[in-house]
Amino acid sequence: MQSPSRAFLLILDGWGFGPKHASDAIYQANTPYFDSLMAQYPHSTLVTYGEEVGLPEGQMGNSEVGHLNIGAGRVVWQELARINKAVRERELHANATLLAALDHAKQHNKTVHLIGLVSDGGVHSHINHLKALCDIAVERGCPRTYIQAFTDGRDCDPKSGAGFLADLLQHIENKPVALASVIGRYYAMDRDKRWERVKLAYDLLVNGQGETVTDPVAALQKSYAENVTDEFLKPIRVQSRAGDQAPITTIQPDDVVICFNFRTDRCREITQVLTQLDMAEQGMHTLPLYYVTMTRYDHSFKNIHVLFEKDDVTMTLGEIIEKAGKTQVRIAETEKYPHVTFFFSGGREDAFQGERRLMVPSPKVATYDLQPEMSAYGIRDAILADIEANQPDFICLNFANTDMVGHTGVFSAAM
């Protein structure tokens, strides 16, 4: 039997087989075409969590992990597992890049800022990694260490941030470490070039602009009462005592900044505006900083110190297609464009020979429940035109709707 000359990998991001009850949006939805495919053709399911995708046992998966493993065609051990091991076995305590940064702060009497997502979601970061960094900074004798916290509410309960902050504050009690600011990931971890969102985070971190509080946990509880959950938490600056006119600290020139998110996509923009990209029209200017990231966010970034370099993932599907002399196209809307390109190619930024990349802009709405179709129709039109014009041998296409709309928690929109 002659094998087909072309292949189409269509990824319904966030679509899965659930418990089949009232809370299962996909099961409750009307999906006649998908149902017909299941009825007519052989099919199977994939395990998307835990050790089967290179994560710690029981740890839920995510889009980055899924695309990386599919593109590699094998289990790729993830940064969460690697860093957990480094913390557990005190390898992080001996990390030369980290120690050099902390020693720089000590020798030059500079402040250390730990910035990143404070939760145990394990998708972008983990609170245990932050706790370890706090401990190491204390052990190394750093004069001042401050936490600039981003709240989650997306990869964990929408109102769990208050508990995480309380846990963190207990951990750093009686240590020369303090919580300086808090802001929701919606602003600090944008990845869609919504610079107006990023500016709120920048202004908090650099200019100290935000609501002034002395009790951050109470401030989060107040926010919940106003129906503003962790993801969308407005900027908060934390003061050590009532009546202070200035925040505890802001990021100053020549300070040491350690961004402890290990996933690469959602701290690129805040790193850009702090260190790489002067955006005068937005009122954001880069600062001369000793800047450290947990992993390498972007190979084009200059003067960034990296704690954990990624494993070199070779012989991915894209590379094999290139070696076979075939053509391929990767297509998604903005939200998932890095997943069908960078992640699917094993962390490779550049396109392979014979590879075309098509990005359809995501809609400019506050949350995707307001436009649950997102840019699916634009993707459809773009790929049909490309097939007609170029006849690619392989297509990798991502529809982001189920994942991105599902994250809003609005059941009717997801269904």
Where are these regions (language model features)?
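Long, well-ordered, tryptophan-enriched scaffold segments
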Residues: 156-159, 163-252, 258, 265, ...
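Structural motif
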Residues: 9-11, 113-115, 258-259, 394-398
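Glycine-rich tight-turn/loop motif centered on a GG-T
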Residues: 84-92, 362-373, 406-415
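Active-site nucleophile/metal-coordination loop of metallo-enzymes that catalyze phosphate/sulfate
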Residues: 2-8, 15-186, 196, 200, ...
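Active-site regions of oxyanion-processing enzymes, predominantly non-cytosolic
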Residues: 4-7, 383-403
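Active-site proximal loops enriched in glycine and acidic residues that flank catalytic Cys/His/Asp
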Residues: 261-262, 293-295, 332, 344-346, ...
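Active-site His/acidic residue clusters
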Residues: 96-97, 392-415
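Metal-dependent catalytic core segments for phosphate chemistry
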Residues: 327-386, 415
